[in-house]
Curated annotation (Swiss-Prot):
Record pathway: Amino-acid biosynthesis; L-methionine biosynthesis via de novo pathway; O-succinyl-L-homoserine from L-homoserine: step 1/1
UniProt name for this protein: Homoserine O-succinyltransferase
Residues covered by the AB hydrolase-1 domain: 50-359
Membership in a protein family: Belongs to the AB hydrolase superfamily. MetX family.
Cell compartment(s), UniProt: Cytoplasm
Source species, domain of life: Bacteria
Subunit structure: Homodimer.
Keyword terms, alphabetized: Acyltransferase, Amino-acid biosynthesis, Cytoplasm, Methionine biosynthesis, Transferase
Protein function: Transfers a succinyl group from succinyl-CoA to L-homoserine, forming succinyl-L-homoserine.
Upper lineage: Bacteria, Pseudomonadati, Pseudomonadota, Betaproteobacteria, Nitrosomonadales
Keyword Transmembrane: no
InterPro entries: AB_hydrolase_1 (IPR000073), AB_hydrolase_fold (IPR029058), HAT_MetX-like (IPR008220)
GO biological process: homoserine metabolic process; methionine biosynthetic process
């Protein structure tokens, strides 16, 4: 739980919930037991009506805000959005962040020990879907004694989870914040994910996903996957403004080492990611993205998919997000309106591309604050 005063956070401590009831996954696989790492922020009120679940994106985790005692630079990934007096105010709401099943930040995943073998699951960890994650999040809510969330929120893949909540458990969520998301990936996005996976799988150190027993990690492949992904998260405008065609050493080297500043930046980001993230988890997360398509069981009719949804919605997109473009958000809005649901929508001018949902933008944060201020607890 996160300790806080009236002005700022102090420190946060992750917690672990263990579940021994078998989990039946969409793939048909079964996990006999599993653990979820989570963090909480603020105080749950007496009516237990002020809980907000925040779902993370591909490379995110349970650490939404605040710091860890042993790392003064460990601010959570949505620290600019969550906190006392911030857009999602922890003086009003009780927030929960959870590392999704299959993750690599403490929840059961490929790097965890399979008690049946005494070894890491590795490639034997089952493929998981957004629907599976929502099932585990419901169990966590039950574990915490929360019957209904005031809101479920998330950006990108996190926004997809918020959508799935309104479909699978409409009676358990009053508001959904769907930010920089889509109701399904385009063929182009699936292609990006496959190239990233192939970079990992073809790394000689991948060893069919069992690199743990070889004492190595597929660093080169994971690095390339992150470099590719990072390009798609940025906009051309933001890359031009930040890097342009600047040369690292001021002159052409006429070789194949790093010359341009953008090359240096991408390699740094790739190396950093490869040292912090598990390759098998990356494969799982991208597959969950690929498989998300709530309209598919309804003859590709997204409006029909939302037939039983009850929540109120805030849907936000960003002008330069070409990975999950504003048109993808507008398609969600149209489907919600077809079902006469309450929807607030805004397309926010931003130069930061898909990563805009993580940025501290005054207009964006004011929109979220205005919406959350009207959420009754």
């Amino acid at each position: 739980m996160l300790m806080q005063d009236s002005n700022s956070f102090s420190t946060v401590t992750p917690q672990v919930a263990r579940f021994d009831t078998p989990l039946h996954l969409k793939s048909g696989a079964v996990l006999d037991s599993y653990e979820l790492v989570y963090e909480t922020y603020g105080e749950l009120n007496a009516a237990r009506s002020n809980a907000v679940l925040v779902c993370h994106a591909l490379s995110g985790n349970h650490h939404l805000a605040g710091l860890y005692d042993d790392n003064p630079k460990s601010a959570g990934w949505w620290n600019n959005m969550i906190g006392p007096g911030k857009s999602i105010d922890t003086q009003k709401f009780f927030l929960i962040g959870v590392n999704n099943l299959g993750g690599c930040h403490g929840s059961t995943g490929p790097a965890s020990i399979d008690v049946r073998t005494g070894k890491c699951y590795g490639p034997n960890f089952p493929v998981v879907t957004v629907e599976d994650w929502v099932q585990t999040q419901v169990r966590l809510a039950d574990y915490l004694g929360i019957d209904q969330f005031a809101a479920v929120a998330g950006g990108s893949l996190g926004g997809m989870q918020a959508l799935q909540w309104t479909l699978d458990f409409p009676e358990r969520v009053r508001h959904a914040l769907v930010i920089a998301a889509a109701a399904k990936l385009t063929a182009q996005n699936i292609a990006f994910n496959d190239v990233a996976r192939q970079a990992i799988i073809t790394d000689p150190d991948f060893h069919g996903g069992d690199y743990y027993s070889h004492g190595v990690i597929p660093r080169r492949g994971l690095r390339l996957a992150r470099m590719l992904g990072h390009i798609t998260y940025l906009s051309d405008d933001s890359m031009a403004a930040k890097f342009g065609r600047e040369l690292r050493n001021g002159a052409l080297a006429f070789g194949y080492d790093v010359e341009f500043e953008i090359e240096s930046y991408l390699r740094y980001q790739g190396d950093k990611f490869a040292s912090q993230f598990d390759a098998n988890t990356y494969l799982l997360m991208t597959k969950a993205l690929d498989y998300f398509d709530p309209a598919f069981p309804h003859n590709n009719d997204l409006s029909a998919a939302f037939r039983f949804a009850r929540a109120n919605f805030l849907v936000l997109s960003f002008t330069t997000d070409w990975r999950f473009s504003p048109e993808r958000s507008r398609a969600i809005v149209r489907a919600l309106l077809d079902n006469e649901l309450n929807v607030s929508y805004a397309e926010i001018t931003s130069s930061h591309g898909h990563d805009s949902f993580l940025m501290e933008d005054r207009h964006y944060h004011r929109l979220v604050r205005a919406y959350m201020d009207n959420v009754v607890v």
